[in-house]
Amino acid sequence: MARATNLNAAPSAGASGPPDSLPSTLAPPSPGSPAALPRASTPCGLSGFSGLNIRSTSSMLTKPLQGHPSPPVTPTQPPGGKDRAAFEAEYRLGPLLGKGGFGTVFAGHRVTDRRQVAIKVISRNRVLGWSTVSDSVTCPLEVALLWKVGEGNGHPGVIRLLDWFETPEGFMLVLERPMPAQDLFDYITEKGPLGESCSRSFFTQVVAAVQHCHARGVVHRDIKDENILIDLCRGSIKLIDFGSGALLHDEPYTDFDGTRVYSPPEWISRHQYHALPATVWSLGVLLYDMVCGDIPFERDQEILEAELHFPAHVSPDCCALIRRCLAPKPCSRPSLEEILLDPWMQSPAEEKPINSSKGSPTPLPWSLLP
């Protein structure tokens, strides 16, 4: 399938040129955006959308990079966004990494130690939600959510907001940038279906990252392969792009800015959903994508029917977990804790060979097994 797009993000026709909110004095030369790699010729079945989907904004920081992993740095969120002069003194903007409906992402580095970062630039008129962080300081909701999940030591599986700045035109979010790294969409596109040991490792880390977010009162609402960043040196993952996220609550949500092919049937049929079962549904789609090499559903009717077909190489235990996560009724889906206790998660089985046109996945350069 083609790379999917957030429902309400107006895709850009291209990634060249500076963003609307970035002053020309800061705009670097624009090399253009890396092309999205389609997995199949059939476009995603998004209602009211046709043509090839463009990758989501924050996943642009996942362009494969060369270099050595950077040491962890504690995020430093000021009570209010600093201004343009402070940004120019503290950071240098690098090449354009990509452009999407909610903003533009550049490479960059911090002046003091040349630490590589990603700089997400958001136009003020494209901010969908606002929040108050402290002392009545108003900021984009995405900043507040990243702050909440990054407070204290944060979590190794969640991207860190290092800094943020406010200009008359919009906002600049400075995010950590593991190097070298690749998003899970590109990784699967390159490797084909992943082995179950690799999938189990990635999936366990994603579930743990989601648990951390929920413990901090944040629901991501756009869990998908494009928003999973793989540190290619360590074999660890990070959950990125909180632009569709929200504060976690028990009441049903009636808005959704995530990716439709990962959305649950209750949203398709009733335009409402609860955070926890909807999250588990998207995790089921993600796990299917990892072990099968593509997502299970492309059109609304397929989501509603939830009919699953598995290649022969996928083990019965893995199939069973995916079926549990993709149960049509929200009340029938497991909790995050129950997912981690599932037999497939607890008892790795010997894998069957994968017959793929791309060949079996290349052995990873890091230890994934307990």
UniProtKB/Swiss-Prot annotation:
Residues 69-78 have a biased composition (Pro residues). It comes from the Eukaryota. One of its GO terms (biological process) is negative regulation of apoptotic process. SMART domains: S_TKc (SM00220). Induction: Induced by a wide range of growth factors and mitogens; IL2, IL3, IL4, IL7,IL9 and by interferon-gamma (IFNG). Residues 1-42, 61-83, 349-370 are annotated as: Disordered. Gene3D superfamilies: Phosphorylase Kinase, domain 1, Transferase(Phosphotransferase) domain 1. Keywords: Apoptosis, ATP-binding, Cell cycle, Kinase, Nucleotide-binding, Phosphoprotein, Proto-oncogene, Serine/threonine-protein kinase, Transferase. Proto-oncogene with serine/threonine kinase activity involved in cell survival and cell proliferation. Exerts its oncogenic activity through: the regulation of MYC transcriptional activity, the regulation of cell cycle progression, the regulation of cap-dependent protein translation and through survival signaling by phosphorylation of a pro-apoptotic protein, BAD. Phosphorylation of MYC leads to an increase of MYC protein stability and thereby an increase of transcriptional activity. Belongs to the protein kinase superfamily. CAMK Ser/Thr protein kinase family. PIM subfamily. This is Serine/threonine-protein kinase pim-2. It comes from Mus musculus.
